[in-house]
Curated annotation (Swiss-Prot):
Pfam families: ESCRT-II. This is Vacuolar protein-sorting-associated protein 25. The gene is vps25. One of its GO terms (molecular function) is protein homodimerization activity. Component of the ESCRT-II complex (endosomal sorting complex required for transport II), which is required for multivesicular body (MVB) formation and sorting of endosomal cargo proteins into MVBs. The MVB pathway mediates delivery of transmembrane proteins into the lumen of the lysosome for degradation. Component of the endosomal sorting complex required for transport II (ESCRT-II). One of its GO terms (cellular component) is phagocytic vesicle. It comes from the Eukaryota. InterPro entries: ESCRT-II_cplx_Vps25-sub, ESCRT-II_cplx_Vps25-sub_N, WH-like_DNA-bd_sf, WH_DNA-bd_sf. GO terms for biological process: protein targeting; protein transport to vacuole involved in ubiquitin-dependent protein catabolic process via the multivesicular body sorting pathway. PANTHER family: VACUOLAR PROTEIN SORTING-ASSOCIATED PROTEIN VPS25, VACUOLAR PROTEIN-SORTING-ASSOCIATED PROTEIN 25. It comes from Dictyostelium discoideum. Belongs to the VPS25 family.
Length: 194
């Protein structure tokens, strides 16, 4: 984590930003701005999961601007998160809760969301390039080595969320660039040159 504080964009300091806009085109632009802000903030602090209830309850600075006395409501935040999910940059952590939500649109059980400020295919490209650049093709690495190893310390995917890493490795498997295998709790990955 950086010692510096995240710099919020100017629009974060405008009161209308915290109120869902009634005009569709304006709301689309507003949701895009919220998506950009949430992804940038999460990337800056390497946040991979957000708990909506906790963010609202704790008055998270991301959703609560005390200087202008404005904060997002839980309903507004859920609408924004739903839009981010629709755009492929997030998903509910508990898939069963997502299914429940489809049955009952007013369901408030969805709380934890996986934030993907890079999509799995982007992470897959970065990981594969790193493996190739380090001369690790046709060798076996553990998921732990990719996430936490000394060789990956300077890589953006160092300490990457396990769920996102596994999704990224699935992308590489579909491209025939790697194969994952597990023994007990350890997951290994063999990367192939193609």
């Amino acid at each position: 984590m950086s010692n510096q504080v995240f710099q919020f964009p100017p629009y974060y300091h405008k009161e209308p930003f915290f109120t869902i806009q009634p005009i569709l085109n304006t709301r689309k632009k507003q949701f895009q701005m919220w998506q950009d802000l949430i992804l940038q903030y999460c990337r800056y602090y390497k946040i991979y999961e957000l708990d909506i209830n906790e963010s609202i309850k704790s008055n998270s600075v991301l959703f609560n601007n005390e200087k202008i006395n404005r904060k997002l409501s839980r309903e507004a935040l859920k609408s924004i998160i739903d839009d981010i999910i629709e755009n492929g940059f997030a998903e509910w952590v508990d898939k069963e809760k997502e299914k429940e939500k489809e049955k009952d649109k007013d369901n408030n059980n969805n709380n934890r969301v996986l934030i993907m400020w890079r999509k799995p295919d982007e992470w897959a490209s970065l990981i594969y390039k790193w493996v190739a650049d380090c001369g690790l093709l046709n060798t076996v690495l553990t998921v732990w080595e990719i996430q936490n190893g000394d060789d990956s310390k300077k890589q953006e995917f160092h300490q990457l969320n396990t769920t996102i890493l596994m999704k990224s490795l699935k992308v590489l498997e579909k491209q025939s660039k790697c194969q994952t295998f597990s023994q007990d709790e350890n997951v290994g990955v063999k990367f192939f040159s193609i």
